[in-house]
From Swiss-Prot:
Keywords: Hydrolase, Metal-binding, Metalloprotease, Protease, Zinc. Belongs to the UPF0758 family. GO terms for biological process: proteolysis. The lineage of its organism: Bacteria, Pseudomonadati, Pseudomonadota, Alphaproteobacteria, Hyphomicrobiales. Residues 1-22 are annotated as: Disordered. It comes from the Bacteria. This is UPF0758 protein Atu1607. CDD domains: MPN_DUF2466.
Amino acid sequence: MAKRPALPSADLSPTSGFEAGEGDLFNGADERGFFAEPRSAPKKAARAVTATEQEADAAHYHGHRDRLRTRYRDGGDAALADYELLELLLFRLIPRRDTKPIAKALIARFGTLGSVLGAPLPLLQEVKGVGEAVALDLKLVASVSQRMLKSEIRNKQVLGSWSSVIDYCHAAMAHETREQFRILFLDKRNVLIADEVQGQGTVDHTPVYPREIVRRALELSSTALILIHNHPSGDPTPSRADIEMTKTIIDTAKPLGITVHDHIIIGKDGHASFKGLRLI
């Protein structure tokens, strides 16, 4: 049997990086794929531009931070808008990012600086750039503020520190998203014994149990009460149910020598006093 003539072999050494195949350089097919080089040079250029832009952005917001700190140092909080104070706080919480957009987004979402600090954790985390750690730190600031205000009425005659009572209650309750019923228990000198939340309900109602309130007052040897609850709607005007509930508590407490000094309703931008409205 005649042997087939040997075909000339192509040098396909591993160093070439290619293998012969159908439609390749070796059978005269389209050569564009072979001569197309990886676009490494343009990519390198793009990366260099991006890095430069990032450095410029970093220099800009670091300079902005310095300027904002200087304004605060020289002029105090009056020199800054709400979003700028929040931005200044976020510098510490988010050290390597431009925090102005986050601060503005928080104010846009919740309306005021106080509302930002009073917002629930899950809602804070819905804002882009605010993770759990940042949200917790914002709530920590709110807690510190409330403790500071509460210290202004501790061990003092509450009726003689009325503006401090209102400031504390507003900080603690104005931005709650559900109704909350709080009681300040006072001794016979009207000094604060205890500050307790007795109930928390829905957006427009919270259950109140007059007998439980009186029982707790007796346990604490309290002889006077200040009732406080919030209206998440923002309007502190007393409802008919608020008036009737207050009367029931007064009627339950009075035979046991416990006085209800006032019932305060806290709204977002103000408060209503039953005593001031001559409802008690």
